[in-house]
Amino acid sequence: MKFTALLAGAAVALTAGFASAETRITYKSAKSTSSYYQMAVQIAEAMKEGSGGDIIVTVEESQGSVQNVMEARARGGDYVFTTPPVLVRLAQGGKAMFEGKGDPKFDEIRALFPIPSLTMHFVMGADSGVNDFADLEGKTVLIGKGSFGAREGAKYLGLFGLEGKVTLADVELSNAVPALKNGQIDGFVTAGSFPAPNVIEAAASTGVKVLSLSDEQIKQTKRAKLVIPAGTYAGQTEDITTTSLPVVAFTTTAMSDEAAYQLTKTYWEQKDAMGAAAAWWNGVDSDLMQHITGKIHPGAAKYYKEIGWALTDAQM
């Protein structure tokens, strides 16, 4: 009887030990059809694999980054979400889409790690005769509707003196490749982590030229400079210089230091394996840390200090 009781006690202790070791995370991502949702699923799988099952991530669909930030007001210590850092700054300042929606909880948002950036692609048909932005005049271009890429594409046309000089095709971005194939458009604009699936398809099926931006044009956009290496797309013999909007995984101060440490450590240790399965992870490296302009969670900061990565005063 005593032996049975001891076994039962040991079983309870073991169960308690496993329960305390397991970290459950809710990861708020993007629309289920987006590349960022695919990334979230890949992160969930990598966390489970890298932690031996101790980190369990549940991916939640989202309508976008603004929703992700807004939900930080009410979520607990298990909440991780993705957004460009600029939206966190706007939320904390009660500006733009967050005007009149300020909340002290926004000041508790903390960064964990960068994920692949939103990368601008101006994709032109190989036979369109377009080699730079000046050549876009008189052409028909699809920029889509309502997305970051559509807003950014329209903004760039205005900045570069092309507003009203380019015909904007009334076609959904999902139909960009067929429209390019049948000559309905001369090119399209898309924003997504490289290599972008629709650009891969277009490059392989019809041949394309992805336009580069000059340093002066990049300065005009007020976005980060990003280089897409030669060979990323079929027929691409030179680097493409373009712009990007950094995207970061955030949590809040409600998350424990240990959970933030383990999440960050496992993410970076699994990044190469993720990159072997999906090339967009290969563009993530320590250089992206400079785009985290706000505070980093103390648990994540502990990991970065361990591996010798310098953090700025603003990040601490």
Model-inferred region functions:
Residues I115-V130, A224-I228, L245-A259:
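A bilobed periplasmic-binding-protein/Venus flytrap-type ligand-binding module shared by bacterial periplasmic
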